[in-house]
Amino acid sequence: MLERNILIIDDNKRVKDIYIPAYLSKINELKIASEKWSKYQFNVEHCSSMHDALNYFSNSKNLVDVLVVDYEFNGETTFSNGIAFVKYIRENVNRYCQIVFYTMQGLRNIDVDEWSALVNSDVFKFVDKSTKEDILGEVIFEAATRRNPIVESFERFWCKYGAMLDTYKYTFDGQEVTFEEIINHIRMDDSLGRVFVEKLLQKSILINTKI
């Protein structure tokens, strides 16, 4: 399935019932207008705490393309704030998923060290939480459609030759996987996905090198 999965991490109780439907409404409006992205399913999930988000990530079946992370989590001690959580995700979970960071505190109230941590964590966009839902929906859509170009290349290949590719099993690094699973490993930047990309690039260089 062609999909993009968005995970919102925010302790605001209105996220699930009010904000997510508004975001999805805008996302679906934008995807319908695009021949390419109209083929994709956009899914939005919600975790109300950083602790729940870590549990979500611990399940290898939960694929995440975009993280939307709040700054403040009242009373939670898993991390000091959303910035520390973002830093942890980048260093330990996924180096390449898109991250949208927002806060009700106002972006100007984030200190220099925190800004530095966010920039070094390659955050896609910073958004004031008071921004209208349709604008944030646009930001999320933009983040979801600017992913790993290698993934998009494989997805296009899969769209064209999927019927044939799905009849095969691929043995890679000692594991038997489907072509769709290979794409998902790259999306999630896990160990198998990293090895596959490395070998793919090495082979591409060798094939195109004239000796």
What do these predicted regions represent?
Residues 9-10, 47, 67:
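Conserved sequence signature across two-component system core domains
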Residues 122, 131-151:
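Receiver (REC) domain switch/output surface
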Residues 50-51, 63-95:
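Conserved phosphotransfer microenvironments
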Residues 148-211:
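C-terminal output/effector regions of signal-responsive regulators
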